[in-house]
Amino acid sequence: MLKFIIPTIMLMPLTWLSKNNLIWINSTAHSLLISFSSLLLLNQLNDNSLNYSLMFFSDPLSTPLLILTMWLLPLMLMASQSHLIKEPPVRKKLYITMLITLQALLIMTFTATELILFYIMFEATLIPTLIIITRWGNQTERLNAGLYFLFYTLVGSLPLLVALVYLQNTTGSLNFLLLQHWAQPLSTSWSNIFMWLACMMAFLVKMPLYGLYLWLPKAHVEAPIAGSMVLAAVLLKLGGYGMLRITSMLNPLTEHMAYPFLMLSLWGMIMTSSICLRQTDLKSLIAYSSVSHMALVIAAILIQTPWSYMGATALMIAHGLTSSMLFCLANSNYERIHSRTMILPGGLQVFLPLMASWWLLASLTNLALPPTINLIGELLVVMSVFSWSNPTILLMGTNIVITALYSLYMLIMTQRGKHTHHINNITPSFTREHALMALHIIPLLLLSLNPKIILGPLY
């Protein structure tokens, strides 16, 4: 595992020692090398996990998320270049250092064997993200967003620490690999119920569950582009990853406890999709669509069948790439028009035809068009939820229709219609932006050809 962690950390001296005109070239090129080398992890055998040491391991659940994390760093660097163009070199280097720190922490989060190490890294990812949001965000509202983000996640995850200390005292170890074999079946006593809640709350806030999601649209809207990308693509997946890891230790209590949360997420899925139809703010719409997609993942994980686990992992990876791409597209609009309102850039298709085709591709993957990986994930989740309880097909069907509606609404509002005069002298799109979109969509299309590599450990 060190072959990814050490090069990532060594990107920092590289950035600080680069000449001012080579900062972006060096950091992007070398982070791309790291992300290409991480693809070798897909080569491992499906039936077992790789134990690198006592600290780190990877199995078919964490490997796709690891690769997604490493794949995103060069993309974030590519996306951030134009909005940092007026900053002094020291600030650019600081910004890149924050992103690199975040990637190193995320790699350690996804490969930790020890629950306490996982918890520390899980919490540590807050710090760089918070700095990125509150320092480089666009409006002054960003401080409020940072506060929401910090307090929601901290209050949610403090009980988890208490639960972990309790687990350590009762079982003597917090190793993932051992606990799965040692865990005593939990009875339905009040103390166990509270422990279950303590374990799950941190991840449900991070996902986020309907009702605990208020920090997400705020953080997304105020964050700079790299903040939005990493938040949508990887930080939300931390919640799903943690839930997948920890539910195996909390059986058979989960079967008793899951009902209210299942209902909440199935209902919240429709509510947040409906909120999307009323949005005027482009970034806010994409943020709410993230909430509704993640609600599907929560439902899938709480049902705990092999099918739903496979659907959850596929949906997490697919959503990571898709929402990140949508944020990049929204950002390229924002840099030209300097507004996130969807009505203003109407008719952009005439001016930026290639960008319009990226918009079309991104919207179609977001609404889970066959044969994309999004559809595979959604189908697996819908089938497993349907076999758990038949009436849920009404909720699921409604959600799929609303998702299609708001995706097409977003596409039509930004690309079609009559263009207004204020976008007549718009700057053309850069090759850098097209490369960025291509690097998002190519993995999605390739995964559609071979989805089995991201279906998790139960495939």
Curated annotation (Swiss-Prot):
Gene Ontology biological-process entries: electron transport coupled proton transport; mitochondrial electron transport, NADH to ubiquinone; mitochondrial respiratory chain complex I assembly
Pfam families: Oxidored_q5_N (PF01059), Proton_antipo_M (PF00361)
Cited InterPro entries: NADH4_N, NADH_Q_OxRdtase_chainM/4, NADH_UbQ_OxRdtase, ND/Mrp_TM
EC numbers: 7.1.1.2
Membrane topology value: Multi-pass membrane protein
Any GO molecular function: NADH dehydrogenase (ubiquinone) activity
Catalytic activity: a ubiquinone + NADH + 5 H(+)(in) = a ubiquinol + NAD(+) + 4 H(+)(out)
Subcellular localization: Mitochondrion inner membrane
Keywords tagged on the record: Electron transport, Membrane, Mitochondrion, Mitochondrion inner membrane, NAD, Respiratory chain, Translocase, Transmembrane, Transmembrane helix, Transport, Ubiquinone
Transmembrane annotation, as ranges: 22-42, 60-80, 92-112, 113-133, 147-167, 193-213, 224-244, 257-277, 284-303, 308-330, 342-362, 393-413, 435-455
EC class (word): translocase
Top-level division of the source organism's lineage: Eukaryota
A Gene Ontology cellular-component term: mitochondrial inner membrane
Functional summary from the UniProt entry: Core subunit of the mitochondrial membrane respiratory chain NADH dehydrogenase (Complex I) which catalyzes electron transfer from NADH through the respiratory chain, using ubiquinone as an electron acceptor. Essential for the catalytic activity and assembly of complex I.
Family statement drawn from the similarity comment of this UniProt entry: Belongs to the complex I subunit 4 family.
Subunit and partners: Core subunit of respiratory chain NADH dehydrogenase (Complex I) which is composed of 45 different subunits.
NCBIfam families from the UniProt entry: NDH_I_M (TIGR01972)
Name used for this protein in its record: NADH-ubiquinone oxidoreductase chain 4
